[in-house]
Curated annotation (Swiss-Prot):
Gene Ontology terms describing biological process: cytoplasmic translation
Gene transcribed to yield this protein: rplB
Protein's recorded name: Large ribosomal subunit protein uL2
Biased composition (Polar residues): 38-53
Gene Ontology terms for molecular function: rRNA binding; structural constituent of ribosome; transferase activity
Family under the similarity heading: Belongs to the universal ribosomal protein uL2 family.
Length: 275
């Protein structure tokens, strides 16, 4: 994997930095593991915008990822590593001994031809998936389930990981990359090691058009709007907001806590916020 600074042949390419991985598969993805993906452009079923700054972008198929890793005791060989336009991490196509193929999140250090395993008897090696009760304390893990059998939901982005801190009864404590310490049931599964493609954060988009290819539309500042459109809008000429920063709906931003899920608050041992 190499970091390439593009030659400044145009203003849009002057600041562009690419991450090139020559180990990725250059052909088409595995057709049996593709699904259609319609662009919603940030609209709900009424056609109203519910998520701003989304729309356009290149069409692409969804790669069906195996987040459960439930084929216990069946060895799987990594056939190839692939690029996935739907996520920051790369994916790996694995071939199980019974002939089935599945996509998984590609862990750091996993290479083509390597053998992976799932289940409570799997060795503690990068890329293997085990229940948390069978993972030694202090192990670096990723792709962590929040409920047993639901599939991995935490630590799935490129370069991320978590650490298993302790086990108490039927729960274990996991420290996430954000600093949050969370309780997870010991029957939940996790994968050993870190997520690969850790250089993803070093890339530079270089130009606005590259974000448009990804389906990201422009973000307009509130102070540049009219008063009807944003609490910061209006004024004669260039003016400051005149108040503490808020969202278009008046909710304070920059540190204001918006978490309202009281049902799972007991699962958070230490919040990611320092105070």
């Amino acid at each position: 994997m190499a970091i390439v600074k593009v030659k400044p042949t145009s203003p849009g390419r002057r600041a562009m930095v690419k991450v090139v991985n020559k180990d990725l598969h250059k052909g088409k993805p595995h057709a049996a593991l593709l699904d259609t993906q319609n662009s919603k452009a940030g609209r709900n079923n009424n056609g109203r915008i519910t998520t701003r700054h989304q729309g356009g972008g290149h069409k692409h198929h969804y790669r069906v990822i195996d987040f459960r890793r439930t084929k216990d005791g069946i060895p799987a060989k990594v056939e190839r590593l692939e690029y996935d336009p739907n996520r920051s991490a790369n994916i790996a196509l694995v071939l199980y001994a019974d002939g089935e193929r599945r996509y998984i999140i590609a862990p750091k250090g996993v290479t083509v031809g390597q053998q992976l395993m799932s289940g409570s008897e799997a060795p503690i090696r990068a890329g293997n998936t085990l229940p948390i009760r069978n993972i030694p304390v202090g192990t670096t893990i990723h792709c962590i389930e929040m409920l047993p059998g639901k599939g991995a939901q935490m630590a799935r982005s490129a370069g991320t990981s978590a650490m298993l801190l302790a086990r108490e009864g039927v729960y274990a404590q996991v420290r996430l990359r954000s600093g949050e310490i969370r309780r997870v049931h010991i029957e939940c599964r996790a994968t050993i090691g870190e997520v690969g493609n850790e250089e993803h954060s070093l890339r530079q988009i270089g130009k606005a058009g590259a974000n448009r290819w990804r389906g990201i539309r422009p973000t307009v500042r509130g102070v540049a709007m009219n008063p009807i459109d944003h609490p910061h809008g209006g004024g004669e000429g260039r003016t400051a907001a005149g108040r503490d920063p808020v969202s278009p709906w008046g909710t304070p931003t920059k540190g204001f806590r918006t978490r309202r899920n009281k049902r799972t608050t007991t699962m958070i041992v230490q919040r990611r916020h320092k105070r």
